[in-house]
From Swiss-Prot:
It comes from Saccharomyces cerevisiae (strain RM11-1a) (Baker's yeast). It is found in: Endoplasmic reticulum membrane; Cell membrane. This is Aquaporin-like protein 2. Residues 1-47, 111-149 are cytoplasmic. Water channel required to facilitate the transport of water across membranes. Involved in freeze tolerance, osmotolerance and cell flocculation in liquid cultures. Is non-functional in most laboratory strains.
């Protein structure tokens, strides 16, 4: 009889005197694909925007350099040279890569970070944070800057 009463007490221990069930039952939360890593939609969207910006900037830089290399390597005047590279070709390729970087920097407001630019365009970053990060990340300042003295 004592075993039966102990089992009964264990079974009704979570009931209050009126017989209402007060046991805490945690709500079932569906396990989503990204809930384990605490990644929400905005985070994924921001990463996607940054990835697209990086792709566009890198593609623009490499495409411009590729075009210059093809022009330098297919120059009709330099086809009579023996095997090897002509110094004019090397200079043109070097200038092509330099102008490619310059063009990419010019397109992205003198700061070669397409991901920051794309975050700004889509409203995920403010202009003040863009300007502050440009000043902090720059290698040089204007003449008379108190920081560079």
């Amino acid at each position: 009889m004592s075993n039966e009463s102990n089992d009964l007490e264990k079974n009704i221990s979570h009931l209050d005197p009126t017989g209402v069930d007060n046991a805490y039952i945690p709500p079932e939360q569906p396990e989503t694909k990204h809930s384990r890593f605490n990644i929400d939609r905005d985070t994924l969207r921001n990463h996607f925007i940054a990835a697209v910006g990086e792709f566009c900037g890198t593609f623009m830089f490499l495409w411009c350099a590729y075009v210059i290399c093809n022009v330098a390597n297919h120059d009709v005047a330099l086809t009579t040279e023996p095997e090897g590279s002509h110094p004019g070709q090397l200079i043109m390729i070097a200038l092509g890569f330099g102008f490619s970087v310059m063009f990419s920097i010019w397109c992205f407001w003198w700061g070669f970070e397409p991901s920051r630019f794309s975050l700004f365009v889509f409203g995920q970053s403010h202009l003040s944070s863009q300007m502050c990060s440009d000043v902090v990340s720059s290698d040089h300042c204007w003449d008379g800057c108190w920081w560079c003295r």
